[in-house]
């Protein structure tokens, strides 16, 4: 399992008492008196001895990639002269440092000591330990590609500023071809084959992926979305088109832009995108729910507003506000056509913090109003909500807003009583996972992130479990091909579940196991997967490039 790390720094300022000056005055008086008794030639207390010089460097230790730079700072006390000189203790082979304290690491892994020395008192110095990281290359251990199709490989190179790799196929031309950009073209038969990425900075470091050829895989579309976006929604309409709405725009340099109100339609027949809408409000982290009358309810996005899209007119119409503002919530279509909206987070003073809520409400399409129902047992955001075959709703996991950060809590909502009851806890706290109701009524819960904000620790799950409503229990863990969170899970027409991150797996309920399938060509940090009427799956988000799994 891969690890997510966080680092915190606390800086404290302390006020020093001025009583030291009074003590010095008494000392000077005593010296004068003793001097007078001894018949000295002066009654002057004399000049106080200068304070000793000390030098410190910040930070005292750090890690740096090969060839990268790092800025150090120095502090000198006990003397008005703050001038210092910088040096590398191990010499030129261990890197260099400028007079301003900017260190540049060598192209080799090692431990280095950066030394700062006082100009006023060269006998005073301090040093910082620099760990120059070793180069590493990583690829998925196993990847899938379609027979005769293409597959984009992305190698992760760490420990150096040089991220370039050289690609090769262990089996030579019989195993296909691969470009300098990592685009693999598979043969029409055979396999598995082995694709290797070797670091340009350190050719001794490489990684190899076993490529399994399958009948299914991803294909990039010739047309792109009208606006690159993420944190949007993508909803299959009764006419077979897909409504893509809102989200956060992506700038030309790949950075995040602004919340958008724009919307567009994807037509599977022509595989093109056309404008519709826009929404009445810009929003991201919202939820779109297809109602029984064919319209789409759009709720939240860290606000309390809601609106309905009508495919017949191509327009959005605001409806009554929700009881509470929320984003990263869930919205579940109940058997009677109403919508359960649960949990999520609201805005707070810290834009980067999560403020989960436990409140829940129901939207009634006939009155276009929201009514509060019983709260969930726990606050939750980025959780999941799965409608079970008998009509109840399983709510699981999510960010809790308190230690440890993620939770293993689960709850069951009963539409008849409009209330939640505690459910069987997940086998491991998690958020940003997926939960998919299978055709047999069980629920596949896959991946997710565990975060312990109190101990600054966390990891990503590479396993999945199956919840059985009949017994309120979970199956043993099933291994996926990679750790995943913020991924997608889509129920296919044949009853299998397509789980996609940087690679793709198919979960077979009959065997309760995962098998590799052709993977995506685009590396998406945030994606929306929409099953089309013909069984294919549309992928959008993080870029204007769209793909179809078929």
Label the model's feature ranges:
Residues 101-108, 182-190:
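Solvent-exposed segments in extracellular or luminal domains encompassing
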Residues 109-121, 190-202:
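A short beta-strand micro-motif common to beta-rich folds, especially ectodomain repeats
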Residues 51-53, 132-137, 213-217:
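Extracellular interdomain linker/stem segments of modular secreted and single-pass surface proteins
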Residues 152, 214-550:
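Kelch-like beta-propeller repeat domains
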Residues 58-79, 139-161:
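Solvent-exposed, low-complexity, repeat-rich "mucin-like" stalks and linkers
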Residues 87-102, 168-183:
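Low-complexity "stalk/linker" and mucin-like segments enriched in Ser/Thr/Pro/Ala/Gly
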Residues 26-56, 122, 129, 203, ...:
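Bacterial Sec-dependent N-terminal signal peptides
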Residues 4-24:
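Bacterial N-terminal signal peptides that target proteins for export
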